[in-house]
Regions:
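Non-catalytic cap/lid and distal C-terminal segments of serine-dependent acyl enzymes
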Residues: 20-164
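Bacterial Sec-dependent N-terminal signal peptides
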Residues: 1-23
Length: 164
């Protein structure tokens, strides 16, 4: 009887483990000297094979943080699986506007988003490392940051969206 129960319990633990790995929080040490957290959402199919995936970068609004998107849109993991893509939600602090400050070297968020986060994601995950497979979007301040970064880094992002 114990052996009969062991198999279903083992299978259940494997399934739970795979689901738990779908949403990661990673920390990137930026050139600004900040340790910044990012949510990375992988499609369920990521665990299978060697497929490379397109990436959507979602920037949060003013007053938010890296976890804002997963909080306001908890179905993001299902959407990542439905559309077979990776979603990355970087931290832009509460008011960076995702651009480089000419006065404060600790606020170089354009470089962080368009260079550091991209390089980290492409080197740690199986991405399609090409502008044609990268999109950036955001809400409010994040929408501004998405438009700003996409226009200034056309070689990095192939699609852009802005919400509100």
């Amino acid at each position: 009887m114990k052996r009969l129960l062991l198999l279903p319990i083992t299978l259940l633990l494997c399934i739970v483990s795979l689901c738990a790995q779908q949403v990661d929080t990673v920390t990137i040490h930026s050139k600004m000297g900040h340790d910044l957290k990012n949510v990375v959402i992988l499609p369920k199919s990521y665990a299978e094979g060697n497929t490379r995936y397109p990436v959507v970068y979602l920037l949060h609004g003013c007053g938010g943080n890296y976890a804002s998107w997963i909080t306001i849109k908890p179905e993001l993991p299902q959407l990542a699986s439905q559309y077979n893509l990776i979603i990355v939600c970087p931290d832009g602090l509460i008011n960076s506007w995702y651009w480089n400050s000419p006065l404060n070297k600790d606020m170089q968020f354009e470089d962080y988003i368009s260079d550091e986060v991209i390089r980290y994601t492409d080197s740690h995950y199986r991405t399609i490392a090409d502008r044609s497979a990268r999109a950036i979007s955001g809400l409010s301040m994040g929408g501004h940051g998405a438009m700003w970064n996409a226009i200034r880094h056309r070689n990095v992002f192939g699609a852009v969206g802005s919400i509100r």
